[in-house]
């Protein structure tokens, strides 16, 4: 009998990263990201080292767990592919999610209504989320960022090397980070797998849903046509042409009053 090899959590996570193309970088390379690059492909695309990705993921999860109040962690994504991922991450970890446009001054301007003072900031891309990263430097807030091979590391404290442009990669990274946070908090035992699928963190195009619903409506069978006689509830034509009126009997009663001795 051939015994099946049981993968370690690290091997299992790296296998999922390979499937979701977390290791695929870009053709451009930032100087400070060289330490995270494993090799360069023939087409010029840089391949990231997934072993270092896993290590930085573990470190980021420990930093998140060290914060007593989960609401003091703010997760940001201006990139559409990361909007659903940050919302789901906030749902399962208790953090605050800001998906979409960042309002300038949220970390520095105390006058605005959306002003917040988090203890930790997590961004999906330090290039597209440059405004919150810059404000965190003024407010002395540590930053954890998903960094590609061309991502600037200025004001970034913990860089997790990964593909931060693909929707599958972003969904998996936030799923792994949320899973590790739940493991470290003791909410989820390591002996049992997390029942939440990675698909829950995956971004979905609303236009595709509309097209899918239209296709379902077109392929659906039409409603059965009912005959006209099934709705014939009106009285026959002859009844409407009768010369009698409903008050004829009443007129005769008034003409012939009842005798007094009949009362």
Swiss-Prot record:
Q: Which Pfam families match?
A: Ribosomal_S2 (PF00318)
Per its UniProt record, what CDD domains does this chain match?
Answer: RPS2
One of the entry's Gene Ontology molecular-function terms is: structural constituent of ribosome
Task: Kindly give the SUPFAM superfamilies that the UniProt entry links to this protein.
Answer: Ribosomal protein S2
**Location(s) in or outside the cell:** Cytoplasm
Q: Give the keywords, sorted.
A: Cytoplasm, Ribonucleoprotein, Ribosomal protein
Q: Which GO terms describe its cellular component?
A: cytosolic small ribosomal subunit
A Gene Ontology biological process in which this protein takes part is: ribosomal small subunit assembly
Relate the assembly described in the record.
Component of the small ribosomal subunit. Mature ribosomes consist of a small (40S) and a large (60S) subunit. The 40S subunit contains about 33 different proteins and 1 molecule of RNA (18S). The 60S subunit contains about 49 different proteins and 3 molecules of RNA (25S, 5.8S and 5S). Interacts with ribosomal protein S21.
Chain's role: Required for the assembly and/or stability of the 40S ribosomal subunit. Required for the processing of the 20S rRNA-precursor to mature 18S rRNA in a late step of the maturation of 40S ribosomal subunits.
Give the family this protein belongs to, as stated in its UniProt record.
Belongs to the universal ribosomal protein uS2 family.
**Protein name, as recorded:** Small ribosomal subunit protein uS2
Lineage runs: Eukaryota, Sar, Alveolata, Apicomplexa, Aconoidasida
